[in-house]
From Swiss-Prot:
Positions of Mg(2+) binding: 173, 330, 332, 334
Highest taxon listed in the record's lineage: Eukaryota
Stated name of the protein: Phosphopentomutase
Subunit organization: Monomer.
Sites where the protein binds alpha-D-glucose 1,6-bisphosphate: 71, 173, 334-335, 408, 432, 446
Main localisation: cytoplasm
Cofactor binding notes: Binds 1 Mg(2+) ion per subunit.
Amino acid sequence: MAAATPTETPAPEGSGLGMDARLDQETAQWLRWDQNPLTSESVKQLIAGGNKEELRKCFGARMEFGTAGLRAPMGAGISRMNDLTIIQTTQGFCRYLEKQFSDLKQRGVVISFDARAHPASGGSSRRFARLAATAFITQGVPVYLFSDITPTPFVPYTVSHLKLCAGIMITASHNPKQDNGYKVYWDNGAQIISPHDRGISQAIEENLEPWPQAWEESLVDSSPLLHNPSASIGNDYFEDLKKYCFHRTVNKESKVKFVHTSVHGVGHEFVQLAFKAFDLAPPEAVPQQKDPDPEFPTVKYPNPEEGKGVLTLSFALADKIKAKIVLANDPDADRLAVAEKQDSGEWRVFSGNELGALLGWWLFTSWKEKNQDQSNLKDTYMLSSTVSSKILRAIALKEGFHFEETLTGFKWMGNRAQQLGDQGKTVLFAFEEAIGYMCCPFVLDKDGVSAAVICAELASFLATKNLSLSQQLNAIYVEYGYHITTASYFICHDQGTIQNLFGNLRNYDGKNNYPKMCGKFEISAIRDLTTGYDDSQPDKKAVLPTSKSSQMITFTFANGGVATMRTSGTEPKIKYYAELCAPPGNSDPEHLKKELDELVGAIEEHFFQPQKYNLQPKAE
């Protein structure tokens, strides 16, 4: 999305860059509007030094506001997260909300933030949240601004709980330390979906000039429109969470030891409180990682999904105190990774799909014990995204509840869960393979705090039966059928290459012909959610919503395998997800793993063609 063309202004004196006129205009306008001395000074220096390349990076194109909001590095310019772009974004969002809600000035919005900061540009999540609050308050809109850092799920919880019009969370979740983001929730408590992203985007373009009091963030401290929900929401959230504690007596007596890491993010205090709410002894926190630190000094990437590299300190502490289970939240505590020490002495990090199987089984089992009336099953649902394991489908088929698949991302599951709730249905659980879990539908998004404590209760309960998480997972696969999954990605920074790669798959054996084989593996069905084609449907049209702006093709194979190739919405990656599903009974998991490895090898060789497209494999 190109930046709105500003009014004609002469280039800053002495720029002498001979830059294209638009860049001159953008930088001149920036210097008129930006009141942050660090970012405005850095732009002046780039102009004085004639650093055209860096100026193009900063001013080439405005950050695109999508359904995930914004995510970009912090720094100067319209392509970065900084004071001015936060002001502009919030002004647009405010105007859009005014059009959508006649009672915006009665209901208001909630804003919270994580612990990120970027001293070089003076940007931080806290400051961005205060500037966003200022924009709404100057327009007479009540703002519920948390006084300190919170997990991301507290924002959708507050929207639903206080019946607000919208929520904003300033976070870049598990991205590298230089990034920040702006995540938006609608009045139903779920992340926005189209067409709201386009409407907000347009409103941002129409409201680029800072309003008269935009920079006066001290306004928020004295405004009667400002409310601090920290104490009441914290209290209410943990009261609601207690309803999902099924074995309080077991918890009180549990001898299972847990290690928890918040990976320098916001999770520590909240997970401690969650354990207290469940009457579990508090988990042992990794001391080097428990306090928020925007530098993330002990990890290369603050992403627990990366596995053992992020968990090294957790394993060391667990070995020291003889704990068998590690719980790891990402920095904004909306996701959860779990590892368990095996009898061999090795640590097993569960994949998102494996933990989805365990939590899904547990929440259904616990619900069934409380609801003896089996007629309720027809109104009971679980959800997962289309690239996640189909294990919940297998459990649903055998147990008699409903399973639904959505597009990738919790925005789809949150909105679907809300629709089902409105129809009087019960949504027990939703998950995605990227270690995101919705265990309690009072938050219509992934929540790593509730997932951590529910996982701890599950482990404590299993311990009374002398079972480990790994043993229970195996029992689930024996009962409902083995579901062996794998996922990886290739890095590709060039959009043209990505278009060519997917274009080749759509014209594999001549124009408009998808592949019929992948190496030795026969393809039985193809669904392309970029074009809306699905040859398993009678009319060849896909049932799930399609999006021309992202690439996504799913191949079903004659051997029961399913593989999806898709582009990432937030990173320069082409991802793939593959699964082999076997019917219930004692299948041979080793044989299935071998067959899945062969299938993935064929997909990499024939469909990705990394040499031809110069793709960079995932670093092991």
